[in-house]
Amino acid sequence: MAEFKFTDLVEPVAVDKKTALRITVLGGGSFGTAMANLAARNGCDTMIWIRDAETAEEINKTHINKRYLPDFTLESSLRAVSDLEQAVCDRDIILVAIPSHSFRDVLKQIAPYITAQAVVSLTKGVEAKTFSFMSDIIREELPEVPYGVLSGPNLAKEI
């Protein structure tokens, strides 16, 4: 079976570093990877933050997230990083695709680096200890930051 590439469906838009929207996706799971790839394909200057430096390096070399989306070749303009400060600073939008059990902790870690960025939660579910929605956690941990939520029945391989 031939390898499937996103570009077989849609021709990617070239990234213009001067005018491109600067997006970071926090979380290298299947949904975070799919959303980061979609942003890159649509001409955004896109980074994906992955906790593991070796995995980030492998994605940058192979353009494949072998653990979560092994059958998809990612856009060459998508950059994976493992440094949270680098991932968040000087970005326009931060998409958070972190599991709900780690969501609050990651927001606390990025709080010192957030200035005018908008934060959008892609995370499903509620926080187990508090039963808080992810939007409530954003409001608590980043009270001055504009935020949004993307939700619905989405499968990463369909995006």
Identify the residue ranges that each predicted region occupies:
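Rossmann-like NAD(P)(H) cofactor-binding subdomain of soluble oxidoreductases
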Residues: 74, 81-89, 93-159
